């Protein structure tokens, strides 16, 4: 069934800029974990119990230099984003937490720490989800309404999110537009706002890695296709960023180039995920399904 474009002001495409804030919440021997964080730009794997000081400093760069650079880029273009934050990161970087709120961005929960939850029992996962929301509300002044896991989650996750008052879930890669999960255990529909790996700046970290120019070209091609399709059906594009990745100068230049193209193109609605959630819920309420 053809669905006419439905974004505000007749926009053909909704662009969701997502900024992951994970630095300071990653695995760390210094924080009592058995091993150092495995996600490392240099690809170094160290034995359990050994600190990876180099990787720790790379994550610290995200907080010290990457965060202000990315936030300045957004501010100069009057753009808002969804900051998917591991709560502990914001506890350790209160200035960033305050600026997220002051600049009009949204904070989405990305766990309490940046850790997988697939191996948690139900009680532990519930506490993990609840603690993240409580902490983010304390540091930013606003309780998160969305959730993004670190890769793996459980069969209980979506039900627990509903029970804890979350209103959208990002752990899905199956579409280019929002949709309702009406088959939840609670019987209460959950709005799914799909994310995307292919446009994520992690593509400049993982081998074989994109150059910043490769990444910008891919973003532009993605925008072209979704923008054209958006004349007929609703389309949403996700742009995933990390403080320690896109926050580096050469990569930030590619980001700026793409965002300048976005700002110069009519018919693109740059919105937080909470804004997309509210708009979709009003336009396509689950009661009409």
Feature-to-residue mapping (PLM):
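Positively charged, amphipathic and often flexible ligand-engagement surfaces
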Residues: 177-178, 192-214
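Catalytic alpha-helical scaffold of carbohydrate-active enzymes acting on polysaccharides/glycoconjugates
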Residues: 1-191, 216-239, 245-289
């Amino acid at each position: 069934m053809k669905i006419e474009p439905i974004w505000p002001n007749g926009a053909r495409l909704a662009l969701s800029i997502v900024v992951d804030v994970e630095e300071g919440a990653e695995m760390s021997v210094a924080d009592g974990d058995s091993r150092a964080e495995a996600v490392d730009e240099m690809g170094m794997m160290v034995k359990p119990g050994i600190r990876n000081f180099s990787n720790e400093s790379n994550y610290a760069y995200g907080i010290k230099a990457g965060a202000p650079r990315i936030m300045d880029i957004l501010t100069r273009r009057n753009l808002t984003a969804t900051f998917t934050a591991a709560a502990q990161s914001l506890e350790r970087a209160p200035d960033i937490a305050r600026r997220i709120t002051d600049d009009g961005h949204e904070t989405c929960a990305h766990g309490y720490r940046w850790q997988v939850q697939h191996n948690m029992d139900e009680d532990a996962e519930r506490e993990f989800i609840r603690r993240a929301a409580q902490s983010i509300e304390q540091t930013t002044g606003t309780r998160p309404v969305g959730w993004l896991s670190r890769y793996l989650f459980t069969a209980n996750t979506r039900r627990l999110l509903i029970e804890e008052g979350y209103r959208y879930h990002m752990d899905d890669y199956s579409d280019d537009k929002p949709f309702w999960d009406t088959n939840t255990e609670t019987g209460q529909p959950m709005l799914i706002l799909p994310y995307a790996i292919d446009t994520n700046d992690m593509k400049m970290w993982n081998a074989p890695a994109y150059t910043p120019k490769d990444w910008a070209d891919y973003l532009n091609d993605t925008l072209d296709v979704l923008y054209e399709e958006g004349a007929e059906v609703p389309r949403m594009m996700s742009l995933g960023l990390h403080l320690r990745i896109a926050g580096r100068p050469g990569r930030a230049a590619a980001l700026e180039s793409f965002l300048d193209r976005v700002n110069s193109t009519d018919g693109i609605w740059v919105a937080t995920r909470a804004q997309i959630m509210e708009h979709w819920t009003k336009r396509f309420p689950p009661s009409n399904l």
